[in-house]
Amino acid sequence: MADVSNRVHLNPTTAQLVEIALLRGEGQLTANGALVAKTGERTGRSPNDRFIVKEANTEADIEWGKVNRPFDAGKFDALWGRVEAYLADKELFTSELEVGADDEHYIPVRVTTEFAWHQLFARNLFIAPETFNRGNKDTWQIINAPGFVCEPQRDGTNSEAAVILNFAERKVLLAGLKYAGEMKKSMFSVQNFLLPAKGVLPMHCSANVGHDGDTTLFFGLSGTGKTTLSADPKRFLIGDDEHGWAPGGVFNIEGGCYAKCIDLSQKNEPVIWDAIRFGTVLENVVLDEQRVPDYKDTSLTENSRAAYPLEHIAQRKEDNRGAEPHAVVFLTCDVSGVLPPVSVLSKEQAAYHFLSGYTAKVGSTEMGSTSAIQSTFSTCFGAPFFPRPAGVYAELLMKRIESFGSQVYLVNTGWTGGPHGVGKRFDIPTTRAIVDAIVSGELKDVETVYIDKLNLNVPVSVSGVDTALLNPVNTWADKAEYDKYAQQLAQEFSDNFAKYKVSEAIKNAGPNV
């Protein structure tokens, strides 16, 4: 973007941005040194206001529909021009950042924001390189103008706000909304489109590495435990949300973390707790009279967040990279209480459950979501962010698993002993013990028992886990009731999977109806 203002702060520091944000009344300083900001009525993503410009070069490769809504190229250019005109007399903030911790696969991006705290968020979540765009690649542009109000009839938008991706012009436009997560997810969507063409699998997952260099991936929707479980004091964090898996290794797409704060505690999540300090942005977190964050207060939203750079984590992989993963964990939050806490998956089962993406919306990141918990199927454990047809990503996953020999596990962080409201949720220490067993290799050749209805193989024992919890039928007081719920869940899987055109081997890898 050309200099649309003679008051542009180029590559501002954290201290400068915090200072300016406070002076402008954009947020408050908390007792732990973080900057807290509120986003108004939009406290999550706005999927109905997200568009991709329809143009000849990419039109045939995008799966158009409710997730990827088409936008007219002419309308985009007109709207971009209006937003630039709106920003012309404003004090702005611009940083030269990168998306992708990989020399070959990074995207250079110039981020311009109206708000200082949005710029701090971008600098925390993207990568601030020592030398910008060392490979002289074509640079993307992000403009974020929350004060601009779209007019649907004039602009072609769905409401007063819009998030629009334009692959032909390498532009992302955010207008009329304050929720900062839209910035990071927009560039994730861009990488999700571009990477598969290079043979790289983009993933909605977290990743960490052990002292021996063994990498583990954690796939899952918001609230299933990606950030919590990957922030392991015994291992080194690569990243908490977005990664690429190329032949030879895994790399973080980001340079920071965007952790959910609901019920955050120092005891259960010490790594995240310690990362929240000066330089961190707290989004929609309520403060008490002493400016101490109250992470239990959900009066603003269930989707309160902390955005901090990876440098805030002591135990991290400094190059944001790792070897190919020995273990791949699919995190599912089962509200029916039917699935076991851990299952060992075959390659075909891995493909089936990756495409299914069964889980629950727990403190959903979407605008308007309430505390009501409901089951959902989200393809590739991140349907809102993948522009290409699902099969493209599933095929890449199978290719990577087969070529490296990764073992895939399905881990239920949801309920047992009954559905939500009757049973109880697996506690974090139990899930951590399961993950410890996975990363140690204990479960790779473990003895298993077969659960016919679910078509899953379950370990007969896991170190540190009560054996009675491993087979879910044993945790239900009423076995007939369990069978009823299991049958219902199997049918839901089957109904959802009917839309996929895959091999019989993959089709038959799901629950038995």
UniProtKB/Swiss-Prot annotation:
Keyword Cytoplasm: yes
GO terms classed as biological process: gluconeogenesis
InterPro entries: PEP_carboxykinase_ATP, PEP_carboxykinase_C, PEP_carboxykinase_N, PEPCK_ATP_CS
Cofactor(s) required, per the database record: Mn(2+)
Reaction(s) catalysed (UniProt annotation): oxaloacetate + ATP = phosphoenolpyruvate + ADP + CO2
Residues at which substrate binds: R45, Y179, K185, R305
EC number(s) from the headed UniProt entry: 4.1.1.49
UniProt remark on cofactor binding: Binds 1 Mn(2+) ion per subunit.
Origin superkingdom: Bacteria
Binding residues annotated for Mn(2+), in chain numbering: K185, H204, D241
Pathway(s) it belongs to: Carbohydrate biosynthesis; gluconeogenesis
GO cellular component, one term: cytosol
CDD domains: PEPCK_ATP
Coarse class of the protein's main subcellular location: cytoplasm
Keywords attached to this entry: ATP-binding, Cytoplasm, Decarboxylase, Gluconeogenesis, Lyase, Manganese, Metal-binding, Nucleotide-binding
Gene3D superfamilies referenced in this protein's UniProt entry, alphabetically: 3.90.228.20, Phosphoenolpyruvate Carboxykinase, domain 1, Phosphoenolpyruvate Carboxykinase, domain 2
Transmembrane segments: none
Role of this protein: Involved in the gluconeogenesis. Catalyzes the conversion of oxaloacetate (OAA) to phosphoenolpyruvate (PEP) through direct phosphoryl transfer between the nucleoside triphosphate and OAA.
Complex and partners: Monomer.
Family named by the database record: Belongs to the phosphoenolpyruvate carboxykinase (ATP) family.
Record-given protein name: Phosphoenolpyruvate carboxykinase (ATP)
